[in-house]
UniProtKB/Swiss-Prot annotation:
The lineage of its organism: Eukaryota, Metazoa, Ecdysozoa, Arthropoda, Hexapoda. It is an enzyme of class 6 (ligase). This is Glutamyl-tRNA(Gln) amidotransferase subunit C, mitochondrial. InterPro entries: Asp/Glu-ADT_sf_sub_c, GatC. It comes from the Eukaryota. Subunit of the heterotrimeric GatCAB amidotransferase (AdT) complex, composed of A, B and C subunits. It catalyses: L-glutamyl-tRNA(Gln) + L-glutamine + ATP + H2O = L-glutaminyl-tRNA(Gln) + L-glutamate + ADP + phosphate + H(+).
Amino acid sequence: MLRLFSSRFYCKIATKSNEKATKLDFKQLTHPTKVPQTPVDSKFPDTSASEIQIDTKTIQLLERLSLVDLDSERALATLKSSIQFADKIAHINTEHVRPLYTVLEHQQLQLRNDQVTEGDCRAEVLRNAKVTDEDYFVSPPGNIPLEQ
C-alpha cells in the first residue's frame, strides 16, 4: 500500500506502509527555485583590503543612537566586520537582476479580505504601559544615558 503525504502540493513524499519515508529530492520539485542550492561566495567583491577606520566621535554617536556599549575590543571588531560585510553588499552588481519578492514565486497565496473585527481600543491598550507620551509607549532607557 502506498501512502502519499501532500500537505503542500510542492512537497510530496511517497512511502510504503512498512518502509521509512524517502528523502525529498528538491531537483524534482514542480517549481524550481532561483535560490542557489550551495553557498555562493564568488559574487561578493573583495573589499577587505581596506582597513575600516572609525573615529571616537562616530563611535560615541553609534553608542548613543543604538544604546549599545562599544568599549570592548570584541564589540569594535564586530562593528568593523559588520561594516565590511555591508560594504561588500553595497558593491554587488545588481544591474539586470529582477527583484525577488518571495522564494515561492510560482505559488499563489490565498489572501483574505481586510476586515476590522476589533477596533478603537487605544485607551485599553495604553493602560498596560507604565509611562506614555502622546499616545505612545515610553520605553526605559538603555545602558547609556541619552543626555550628553
